[in-house]
């Protein structure tokens, strides 16, 4: 079982190196290259200590999109000497969960190997689907890792939540997003290094601001921008502010006035203004203006002045 999984992972990585989106290819292979979330992944933190002691608990990763939830789950599985079974709550159901549980029981009986069940977007599973997981977390058949952008107390059933530690991930800082983008530009193996892209300082700032802490948004926009530019006579691809702004605006933004997206959009607008990024400010202002929030004639506070 472990050998087959290793072969699958090898083939997946080969494909990822050639065809997968940049954000997928740039997932860090180790904790040493993981950017941000040091309050969780730091060498002296609880999660790392549990890994070192081979006492990994079931836990839930709660945080905004692009903050590293899926990457962290994969990294945790590497040193845990366990079979890693990932599913998405969007595309999987009870039959998939029961199949994984059956394989976990077989691994446990025949190979004395643990199984990590990783459920991405656990909030998309209803109560009945979450109930299927519950007894197998209780008896230790699986170590459960869930990832969600929603408040766990509202979306995860209480019995399952009571058996899990909740780790809260933060949106990546502008410095962290900038580091990830720069790494992608120079990485010749999984990044864009072979394309010799040169990102103008203003373009990098715009990319970081509009990404608003989401590394996936930044990397996807970067990849779009780089491939939108033809190399010059020297083989260089010059990426200016206009190209980056265009790449960012091709993204369909998620905006929900009733949820956190409303406040995230206002936050991104304020950061763009304070960061002296007119293109970014106009982008987020237009998004606010064309939303239902405009009907409320809302105003935002910018350093003591309301607009």
Segments (PLM) and residue ranges:
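Walker A/P-loop
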Residues: 8-10, 51-52, 56-86
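Pre-Walker A (pre-P-loop) alpha-helix and adjacent loop at the N terminus of AAA/AAA+ ATPase modules
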Residues: 17-58
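Short glycine-rich substrate-engagement loop in P-loop NTPases that contacts/grips substrate
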Residues: 87-113
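Conserved AAA+ ATPase "SRH/arginine-finger" region at the nucleotide-binding site
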Residues: 166-177
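Short conserved motifs of the RecA-like P-loop NTPase core
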Residues: 194-210, 265
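C-terminal helical "lid" of AAA+/P-loop NTPase domains
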Residues: 205-209, 216-230
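Conserved C-terminal helix/linker of AAA+ ATPases
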Residues: 229-250
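Conserved small/polar residues in nucleotide/adenosyl-binding loops
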Residues: 289-296
């Amino acid at each position: 079982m472990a050998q087959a999984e290793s072969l699958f992972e090898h083939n997946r990585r080969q494909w990822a190196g050639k065809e997968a989106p940049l954000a997928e290819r740039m997932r860090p292979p180790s904790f040493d290259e993981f950017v941000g979330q040091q309050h969780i992944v730091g060498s002296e933190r609880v999660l790392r200590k549990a890994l070192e002691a081979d006492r990994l608990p079931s836990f839930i990763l709660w945080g905004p999109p692009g903050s590293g939830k899926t990457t962290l789950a994969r990294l945790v599985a590497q040193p845990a000497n366990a079979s890693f079974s990932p599913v998405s709550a969007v595309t999987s159901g009870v039959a998939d969960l029961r199949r994984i549980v059956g394989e976990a029981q077989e691994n446990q009986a025949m190979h004395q190997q643990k199984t990590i069940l990783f459920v991405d977007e656990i909030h998309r599973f209803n109560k009945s689907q979450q109930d299927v997981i519950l007894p197998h977390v209780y008896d230790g058949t699986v170590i459960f890792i869930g990832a969600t952008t929603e408040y766990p107390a509202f979306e995860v059933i209480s019995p399952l939540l009571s058996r899990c530690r909740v780790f809260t991930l933060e949106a990546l800082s502008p410095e962290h997003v900038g580091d990830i983008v720069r790494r992608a530009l120079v990485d010749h193996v999984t990044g864009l290094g072979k394309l010799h892209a040169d990102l103008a300082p203003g373009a990098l700032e715009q990319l970081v601001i509009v990404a608003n802490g989401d590394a996936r948004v930044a990397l996807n926009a970067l990849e779009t921008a780089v491939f939108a530019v033809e190399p010059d006579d020297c083989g260089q691809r010059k990426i200016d502010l206009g190209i980056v702004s265009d790449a960012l605006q091709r993204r369909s933004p998620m905006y929900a006035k009733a949820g956190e997206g409303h406040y995230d959009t206002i936050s991104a607008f304020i950061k763009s203004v304070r960061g002296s990024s007119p293109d970014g400010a106009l982008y987020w202002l237009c998004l606010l203006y064309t939303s239902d929030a405009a009907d409320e004639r809302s105003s935002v506070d910018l350093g003591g002045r309301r607009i």
